[in-house]
């Protein structure tokens, strides 16, 4: 998992960016659910983009597959936690974000150049972005308190559930 974090870290917009960390949040029949965070040294630091291109590639890899719930989504902002009661496995869906863990958050993440990569991810696979054009998910600066590092110095960038090795 560390190698994937370091590859991810090379694709982060830097603003007192310290590194990456993850935590295990659940163990289910669908696998282990991890949350991945970008870490910063100042509580007011803001993450506004995660990007990759030829000179700063990103690898999101897995030895088996990522769990993708049938009613889930590629971006956390489109997951409504009100549906967790009816679809309990939805809370373990794999997704990307900048700060928000569901539709109750403040992040309005946009993307450019990610359609092919997100499609592979939604099919359960990983991807590598290493092209001249690249890809990014991002939000407008100063629009989302969830994108600020806060007291713990962390900004959530994704949740990944797998029965394999990330």
Task: For the regions a language model picked out, list residue spans one by one.
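Non-catalytic macromolecular-recognition regions in eukaryotic signaling proteins
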Residues: 16-166
């Amino acid at each position: 998992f560390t190698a994937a974090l370091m590859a991810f870290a090379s694709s982060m917009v830097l603003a007192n960016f310290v590194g990456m960390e993850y935590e295990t949040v659940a163990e289910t029949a669908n696998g282990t659910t991890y949350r991945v965070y970008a870490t910063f040294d100042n509580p007011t630091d803001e993450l506004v983009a995660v990007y990759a291109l030829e000179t700063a590639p990103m690898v999101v890899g897995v030895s088996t597959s990522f769990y993708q719930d049938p009613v889930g989504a590629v971006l956390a902002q489109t997951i409504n936690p009100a549906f967790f009661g009816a679809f309990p496995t939805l809370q373990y869906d794999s997704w990307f974000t900048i700060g928000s863990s569901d539709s109750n958050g403040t992040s309005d993440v946009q993307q450019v150049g990610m359609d092919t990569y997100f499609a592979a991810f939604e099919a359960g696979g990983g991807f590598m972005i290493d092209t001249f054009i690249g890809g990014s998910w991002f939000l407008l600066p100063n629009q989302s308190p969830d994108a600020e590092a806060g007291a713990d110095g962390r900004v959530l960038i994704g949740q990944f559930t797998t029965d394999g090795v990330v």
